[in-house]
C-alpha cells in the first residue's frame, strides 16, 4: 500500500463523520477493537490494501452494523473489481462468514447453532419428517472429500436441522 493511500484510509477512519457512523456499534465491541481487527485483516491481505478508501470504510461500517469483527470466520473482507465503474476499481466487500451468521442467529433468536461438514468416509444418516434425526460419526482417519454440510439449531428443548449438498 502506498503511503498516500494509507494516509487517506487513516483520515477516513478517524474523521468525525466515521466516528458518528460508528455509534451503531453494540456495547460489546469497542471502536478501537473493531478498527484494530479491521487493520489486522487489511494488512494480512495485500489486495485489500489496494481497495478504494470508500469501499474499505463501507466494509468497516458493515462490520459495525452487524456487531461482528472482521477476520476469522465471522466476516470476510473480499477484494473485488467493480466492473460497473470506469477503470474497474478494486473494492472491499464485507461478507458474513458462517460463524458470523451463527452469532447473529444466537443474538436474535437465542437459538444455539452447530454447523458441520460431512466427508465421504464419515458415517452419516438422517431422516426428515415427524421423526427427523441426524446421526454423524466422523471418520477417525482419512476422511475423504466433503460432500455435504448441515446445521443443527436448538432452542427451548426443540431441535431442527438443515442439510446442504456440495456439488
Residue ranges, per PLM feature:
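Binding-interface segments
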Residues: 4-167
